[in-house]
Amino acid sequence: MAHPIQWKVIAMYDSNLDNIWHVEIKFVEDDTHTHATVRAQLRDGQAMTTHGDAYRNPNDSSQPMVGEEIAAARALIALGTELLQAASARIEQVTHRPVHLQG
């Protein structure tokens, strides 16, 4: 049976400590699958949502924390990729040149 788990993880600050980004990770799990949803609320009011999954081999022992770590890591990597793409687009709007940021 799937059960949601809510876990608030990060509050990131800029150099002036004035602006806060809220990043929330929610989990839904069953016997062999963990799904993580990451939602980041940015300082400009924009929200980004990404997802990550982890699957356990049915022959392996159940270790829910491991599934959560893997699913969360995959969702956070996806969030990082989206943030880099958004930053690239903002830079391109100003410079009118292609930008390729790497993680």
Tell me the role of every PLM-derived stretch.
Residues M65-T81:
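Short, well-ordered alpha-helical segments
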Residues A2-H35, L84-G103:
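C-terminal binding/interaction regions
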